Amino acid sequence: MHIIKPVWLTHGGDRKDYEVYSCDVSPDGKRLVTAAGDGYVRIWSTDAIYNAADPEYADKPKQLASLSNHSGTIHAVRFSHNGKYLASGADDKIVCVYVHEPNPPSHTSTFGTNEPPPVENWRTIRRLIGHDNDVQDLGWSWDSSILVSVGLDSKVVVWSGHTFEKLKTIPSHQSHVKGITFDPANKYFATASDDRTIRIFRFTSPTPNSTAHDQIQNFVLEHTVKAPFVNSPLTTYFRRCSWSPDGTHIAAANAVNGPVSAAAIINRGSWDSDINLIGHEAPVEVCAFSPRLYSFSPPGKNATDNQGNAGPTLVTVIACAGGDKSLSVWITINPRPIVITQDLSAKAISDLAWSPDGKNLFATALDGTILVVRFEDQELGYPMPMEENEKSLTKFGTSRRGAGIVESANGLLLEEMSKAGEIKGVEGRMGALMGDGHPSTDQGVNGTPGDLSRSGAATAGTATPTGTQKPQQNGTPNGTPGDQEKPDPYAAKLERLKQRPTYTKDGKKRIAPLLVSGAGGTQSSLPQSRLVASSASGLAGRSEGPETVLDLSKPFDGLPKGGIAAILFGNKRKFAQMEDGEDNSVEKRVAAASQHGANPVLINEPDGLVPAAQTARELQETPEFIRPAVVNPVMAVSQIRLAVPKVRVHIVQGIDTFGNPTSVSSGLASSSQSKADLTLEARNHSGPSLTGRVTDREPSRVSLTRGDQPLWQDFLPKAVLLVTGNKKFWAAATEDGSVYIWTPAGRRLVSALVLEAQPVLLECRESWLLCITAVGMCYVWNVTTLTSPHPPISLAPVLDAAVHTMTQTPTTVPSIIAARISSQGRIILAVSNGDGYSYNPSLYTWQRLSEPWFAVASQYWNTTDSSVGDLQLARNQTGPDAAISAGIIPFLERNTTDEIVVRGRAYFLQRLIKVLLSKEGFESFEAGASIAHLENRVAAALSLGAKEEFRLYLLMYAKRLGAEGLKMKTEELLEGLIGGIFSEGEEKENSVTGDKGKNSEEGLWECESDTICGWPRRDLLKEVVLALGKHRDLQRITVPYAHLLGILDEDKNEADAMVIT
C-alpha cells in the first residue's frame, strides 16, 4: 500500500489551503473531482496523481478544469454513473449540473488569478433550485435516471436525470440530512439524518418523459432504521453512508455500539444491524464500499470444480474515516481491519472515493488534504469483473412494483401505443426547448402529429426545422407549396429586433443581444403564458405577446388598492351610547321624537344605532374629486355596504380600433399600448350653483370624440360616477343609481335603468353589461337583446354573510379585488381572502372555482401538464368557440396565490398541511386533495364552457387517476365521456331536440349528445383511453373501450399496410 500526496493537489489560498469537503472519481477512472471552501470544483488528472513522482509527467497537465459557479462553500460533487454529467451542491442552496464538451475550451485562465488554463471544456447546463438551506450530499442512481440531493433543510429532493425537472420533494426527515447512497440494484436509496435515523426509500426509475405528476406512488418510504443511532452524536459534518456492490448491505456512518463509535452494517430486506465496525475513537463520518467484488483466487479459478462445488467466496471491501483523522479498511470476511492509518490528516476526513478498478482510494480532509491510497495487487484480493456484480444483483430482480401483469396481447399493444404517444410528445417539447421549430398546428391524439406524411422521410423524433428545409433535386419543395410560398410573418419583426441599440443610464450605447435559436417562424409547443389581454383577430392586430385569450372584461377604472371595501352589519343591532348632552340614552331620544309624530332616522354606526345628524361642513381642498356621492337612503338599512366611488370632475375612457380598452394619454402612448381611437368623456360641474341653491347644479356632460373630432354629446341631470363602453354601446352610471346606455352613434338605447343604490362597479364585454351597486346587488344585461340572464343577485354569499350576520357589531369582510364579466355573460369575482367565484345562471347560485385550500394542499396548483399541450389558441384549428371563458380559471388561481402570499395565510396553511400529513389517518391526504383540485378544475371548465382548458384538465385528471389506480372513478369517467357516441340516429335526434337543446347538453356528463364542452366525445374518449393505457391494473377497463373506439384495429391496419408495402 502506498500513500500519494502531491504538493500541487490542493485548493490553495493566500494563507492556507481551503477545506476540501468532497471528492469523486469518474466512471472511466481518468478524472478526480474535488470541492472545497474556495467555491471551486476542480477536476484533476488521475494519471498525473498516480505518477506524481515520475519526472516524465512533470510537464503534463495536472488540473484539467476549474469551475466556479457557486457563491459559497461546495459540500458535494458526484459524477453520474454513465459519465455524462457532473453535479455539485453548495451552501448557496443550488445544485449545478455540468457536462463535458468535446471541443477544446475557448477561454484561457482568468486575469488576476493563479489558475492554470483549462485543458477540458466543462459547461454548466442546469442550476437546480429546490432547497431552502445548504446542500450537504448528492447521489446518482446507477442508471443515472435520477439525481437526489439532501441538505440542512431536512429535505430530500429528487431530480430527473434526463430533463433535471424536480420530480418530488420528500420531507420525511425531522432534522438535517447529511448523507445519501443508492442501491446498485436500482431499487432503493437510503438517506442519513441528524434525527438519528436512516430512511430507506423504494423507487422505480422514471422514464425520460416522466413528470412530477407521474411520480405520486414513486419514491415511497420503505423502512426507517433507528437502533444503531439512538445515542449517536449530532456534531458530525457528514453522515455519508455507502451501499455494497452486491446490494446486500449498507454501511452507515455515525453509529454507536454502547459508548463506542462505530460504523453499522445494515442488512438488506430485514433492515436490521447485527454487525458493527468498531475501532475509531471519534464518530465515523464517511463510509465507502469498493465498487468491485474481490476473491482470494485468480478470476480464472473461480469456476466450479469437477465435483460441482462452488468456487471461492466473493467478498467486499469497505473504507471508513471520520473525526479521529484515521482511515480503516475492512474486508467482510475478517473481523478486524486489514489496515488502519492514523493521523492521515490534521483535521477530520470528509470524503472517500474509490477508483472504478478498486485499487485506489482517494481521501479528502478539512485541513485541505487530498491524497490517494494505492493498493498493490492481491493486497485486497483479486478484483472480479463487473459481470460478477451483475450476477450478484440478479437475485433482487428487475420487476416494477405495482406494474402488474399484462393479461392479453391487446393490453400490451395499448400500453405500447400509450408510451409511444408520450415519447413523441416529450421529443417535441425537448425540440422546442432546444430551439428546434416544431409546428404545433396539427396535434393528433396524445400529442402525435395529425398528418405524418408532411414530415417526409424523417423518422420519429427527428427535429426538422420548417424554416430551413431545402428543395429537392427535382425542384419540388419538401413541404406543401402553400407553406413554402407564404412569406414568414416574423421576418420583418426579427429584422427590427436585430442590432437594436439601447442606452444605459450613463449614456453608453449597447446592442441588445438576440436569441438566434428561437428565430424560427414556427410556434413553440411549450406552454405559453396563460394570462394576457384579448387580442384582436387578424394578423394586423396581433401583438408581440402570446396569443392566449383572457375572456374577461378589462376594467376601465382601476379598483382602489386592496379592492372595494365591504362591511356587513348583523341582524341584532343595539343603540349606541351618547356621551354629550344630559340624556345619553338613544332609546329615550327616539321615544321623545316619536311622541310628536316624527319618525326619527337611525344610522348604523360601528358602535350601534344613532340618530342622524347634520355633518359639519368645512372648506377643504379636493384636487382629485369634487365630493363623496350622495348616500342613498337604502344604505342606512342594508346589511351590506360597499365603498362608493367619489364624484370626480373629469372621467375619460377610451377604446382602440379593435374595441379593446386602452388608456388615454396625450402623445405618450408606448409601444405596448395602442392609441385610443374613441374617447368617452364625462365632465361633472364643480363650481357653485348658478341659482344659489345647493340642489340646483349644472348638468353633467357626456361626449364621445375620435381624435379631436366630436361625434356626439349628451347631458345628464346627476353627477356621473362610472363610465364604460365598447364598439357596440356606451354606458354611464350616476350617483342617484341610474344607468344610461347609448348606441355608438349616441342614441339612447333604453330609458334610464333605475337601481336601488349607487353603482360602485360598471363593466362591459361584447353585448353584456355588469353593474354592482353599493348594497351588493349584481345586475347583468344583454344590451343587444335587452334581456337579463337571471334576476339581480346579492353578493352576500360571497362575502360570508351567513357567518357574520348574527353578530351585533359591524364586521369587515373580504374586499372585492376584481369583478369581471365574460363573453357569455358570466360574472367572475375575485375577493381578498383568495377565493374566486362565478355565478351559474342555470343553478341560480354562486360557485367557488378557486380557494386557498387547494393552493397549499394540491400538487397541481398553478401548474399545467405540458405533455398534454398548451392553451395557445389557434383559431383556424380549434374554431371560434375556443376563446369562450378562456383563461378564467388560471386568472382566479393566480389571484388566490397572490392574496394568500400577500396576507400571510400561506405560511399558516402550509404548517397545517404539514402537521396533517404526519398524523395517522391522513396518509393519503395530499393525493386526495390533488385529485379534488383536478375534479374542481374539470367541473369549473365544463360549467364555464372553457373548451381548451376542459381538455387540458381532463387529461391531467385521467393521468392522475391512472397513477393512483382508482378503478371506480376511471370507469365512471369513461362512462360519462361515451355519451351518445354509439346511440342510434333517431334516439340521438330526439335527445338533441328536447326541451333544453344541444347547447345545454354540452355541459352535462350523462347525456346523449356527440359533444361535450365543444369537443367531440369520441376524440376526448380516445385521448383518455390512450393516457390510461399504460397502467396495467386498469387495462380490464380501458381495453374494451379501445376495442369500441377502434384504436387497436387502427394500429393493426397500419402494421399490415407496412408489411404489404
Swiss-Prot record:
GO terms for biological process: chromatin remodeling; DNA-templated transcription; regulation of DNA-templated transcription. CDD domains: WD40 (cd00200). GO terms for molecular function: nucleosome binding. WD repeats lie at residues 15-54, 69-108, 130-169, 172-211, 233-276, 279-340, 344-385. Its main location: nucleus. One of its GO terms (cellular component) is chromatin. Residues 456-468 have a biased composition (Low complexity). It is found in: Nucleus. PROSITE patterns: WD_REPEATS_2, WD_REPEATS_REGION. Residues 469-481 have a biased composition (Polar residues). Residues 430-488 are annotated as: Disordered. Keywords: Chromatin regulator, Nucleus, Repeat, Repressor, Transcription, Transcription regulation, WD repeat. Belongs to the WD repeat HIR1 family. Required for replication-independent chromatin assembly and for the periodic repression of histone gene transcription during the cell cycle. PANTHER family: MEMBER OF THE HIR1 FAMILY OF WD-REPEAT PROTEINS, PROTEIN HIRA. This is Protein HIR1. It comes from Coccidioides immitis (strain RS).
